Amino acid sequence: MRVHIVNAHLTYPNWSEGTLNHAMAEKAKAHLGARGHDVTETVVEESFDPEVEVRRHLDADLVVLQTSINWFGAPWIYKRYIDEVFNAGLKSKKLLDNDGRTRSDPTRQYGTGGHMQGKGFFIAATWNAPADAFDNPDNTLFEGRSVDDLLLNISSNYKFVGYTVLRSYGIYDIFGTTDVA
C-alpha cells in the first residue's frame, strides 16, 4: 500500500512547537514502513509544490492528514495547501473534472465528479479538548457532535474528489494531560 502523510502542524513558538504531531507522523512512517508500505510525507510548513502533491495524491492508496486542531480547525496553512493542491488537480483534471452534476443527467449529484474512488482519507489530530467533550449531548460547546462531525470541513474536500473518508483518530486534552502516550 502507498501512503502519503500530510503534516499540517503550524509552529507557534513557545506555545505549540509541533513535537507531538511530528512524533505521530514519524511513528506512522516507521510503523507503515516496517510493514512494507511505501510512505511519503509532506510537511506543509516547510514547503510544497502543488503539482508534486497532486502526483502524490494520485499515487497514494491512503492519504493521512496529521494535524493539530487550532480554533476548531486545521491550521491556516492547511487551507492554503488544499486550495493550491486541489485547484491544481482540478485544472489538470487529475483529481476531478467537475462537481459531478450534468445537464444531460439530472440524477448526478453534487460532489460526485472526482477521480479518487478506491482511495482512503484519514485524519489523525491532536486536540486540547478532552475526549469526553465529544459525542456528549450534555456538552455545552459541541452539543453531542462527534469529532468527525467537527472535521467535516476538512473531510468533505476529500469526499468531494472521490475518497472514502475513514473514521478519524485523536489524541485529546494535550495541554491538560501530562502523559499523552
Predicted segments with their positions:
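Structural motif
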Residues: 47-55, 177-181
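N-terminal beta1-alpha1 ligand-phosphate binding loop
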Residues: 1-35
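A structural motif corresponding to the C-terminal end of an alpha-helix
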Residues: 31-37, 113, 119, 157-166
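Active-site loop/turn elements of alpha/beta-hydrolase fold enzymes
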Residues: 8, 44-46, 69
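Helix-loop-strand module that forms the ligand-binding subsite of alpha/beta enzymes
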Residues: 51-154
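Glycine-rich phosphate/pyrophosphate-binding loop and the adjoining helix
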Residues: 1-4, 20-21, 26, 140-181
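A short beta-strand-loop structural module common to alpha/beta enzyme folds
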Residues: 35-48, 169-172
